[in-house]
Each structure stands twice: as structure tokens, then as C-alpha cells.
Amino acid sequence: MAQLEVGAVQDWIISTSLAQSENGSSETSNEALPLETYETMDSPETNTGTWFNLTGKRQQGEYTVTYGQLFHYDIRTAQLTALTSWSSPNPDRPLMWQQITGSLTPELLIDHSIGLEPHLQAYQVALRGTPDLSLISLTKAVSRDPEASNALKLANVGLWSLAADRLKFIKTNSENWSNSAQAQLDLIAYHAKSIQNQARQSFANAHQQVLVKLMDGQWREALKVLENDPVMQADVRESFKTETSRLWKRLSVAIEDDPSHSTLQAWTAMVMLDRDGPARTKTWLAKQGNSGDRTRALEMLAPELLPPKPKPEPKPNLKLEPKVEDKPIEPLDPTSPKAKPNGEKSPLAIPTSRPY
């Protein structure tokens, strides 16, 4: 019988997984974590031996993280192979087989997703003899096109749809599109589909609806939700203060990639206002030039960043005498001295009689 000495899983694999999922930082250590449970796993194909995990659980902050070591046992050769260590904050299905590329064998996915943030680590599997796992890395672009590197920058901050669209465009204009480049595109497109499905959902909370669209880089669509909800416009900045870190990591990369996008400028300024204060934000806005679309967006997102509207000049309070023709005509008193010059009485005041 094959035997293999199994070591403990290091604590850093959990911390790194959570940091990647949240796109933030997390403290790491070299603490050894025990493997306590044996769990079998479905095989990607028939007659490929037995796949199983030795697993454990650990509380990391607010998350209960499942961690483990993946093994393969070849029945024909009685060979036992340790493949990879892993961790996942999703205890129900931390590992799965899923066809995401055009390869005959499905990929092994490790789910690092947290909340609304999809994040899956993918391995391509070669089953010739001892299984070989090859990570689909999104650290460095395979394509030599400079725009491919920019696409991966977008993907690594969670702007999956923008990254997928960029790579698809590069592919249509590329004469040497490799299988490795296609694997990167397939993995990014898989994430994009996941977050797009979330963005299409109807949320009871309008703030969450806007948040998901912003997470997917749908700048104009997020603004349209606000346009249809005047109540939300009044507190949009306040409601997103807890999401500053999540939004800023996307906005800062997106605005560098597309600096002339007026709606994106407005969202960037709104978050920058809370991060850096009004003075620095106004200075940054001034460097972007004028834009009517951005002004209309800022009226909803951060009106305090707009220059004050000029006050209308007060109308002069002049009391105009009515024109002569507008004065009412006073009835003439025949007995009045004014009726005839020099105070003479008008003949009309002398009674006359006519003989009959």
C-alpha cells in the first residue's frame, strides 16, 4: 500500500485567500493547522483513480474558513500524490469541477468568493499518468499586446466585465492567440458572467443595486438607478462610506485606464471626496476639464464639489409714476375756481332761463 507523509497546512494559505477575496490585506503567520477530516471528491473522468481531501476548519475574523490538502490515488499503480493545499470561506462547496475552457477535462475550481465578490482560483488538469494541476494565473498577461496587461489590471480589482471585453477585442485583432491566452479570457469571462447575473437581479435595497453595478464597472447604469430614485440621491454619499475601500480599488484603476469618461470621473470624485477631502478633489476635477455630463452626475453624487451658482441680480426697487394717460380723470366741479382761469366762475355755473 502506498504511503505518504502529510504535513500540516500553513496558516498563511488562509490569510492569503481572504486577502485576495476581499482585495485587501490580511495578517499572515506560519502557524501549522491540523488536517482532521477525510472527504472524498468526485472524479473529473471515469477510471482516473480516487480524489480526496484532508480538511480542517478555522475561524478567521467573521469567516469560518475550510482548508485542506488535495490528494489523488491511482488504483492501477497504487501511487498516492499530494496535489495542492487550498482554503475557502465557503464550506458547502469549496472545491468543484467546472468546464470553463475548451479543454476536454473540466477545470478544478477553488471558491474564494465572499459576499458579492466572485473570486475563483482555477487549475487545468492533465490526466496522463499522475494528475498534473496547472494554475490559470491572472498575474501576468500571456498575450504580448500591451492592452492585455491593462485588461488583467482591471480583472485583478474585480472589474471582470471590462477586462473580458478588452481581451475579446484583442483576440479579434490577434494573429497568434494562444491556448494560454484563451484560458485567461475564459476564466475572466466566467467571473464576469457571475457578477453580471448579480447586477441583473432586483434588489429591495436600491443602494445595493447601485453598488453591484459599480462593482461591475457599469458607471452609467448605476447613475440611471439614482436618476429614478430622488430619495436615494439625498444620501448616496453617506450610504457608500462603508464601501469606500471596495469602490476605490476599482475606480482608481478604471480612471487611469479611461481618464476621459465623464460619468466615471463623477463617481471617482464622490469617493475621493471622502478619502482625500474637498480641496484635493476639486483640484483633481479642475484638471479633468469641463463636462456637462459630469456636472449633471455630480449634482446627484456630490453637489458640494460644483462651483456655487451665481445669484441673480436683485431688481431695482424703483417707484415709477404712472404716465399721464394712465392717471384717472377726475370729474370737473363747475363751481370750482379751477374750472376757469383767474378764479372766474364758469358760465356753466350761471343758471339760464329761456322764455317759452
Identify the function of each model-found stretch.
Residues 2-182:
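Long, contiguous interaction/recruitment modules in multidomain scaffold/adaptor proteins
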Residues 5, 22, 27, 31, ...:
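Glutamate identity and glutamate-enriched acidic tracts
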Residues 145-304:
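Alpha-helical protein-protein interaction scaffolds
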Residues 260-356:
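Terminal, low-structured helical/coil segments at or just beyond the last alpha-helical repeat
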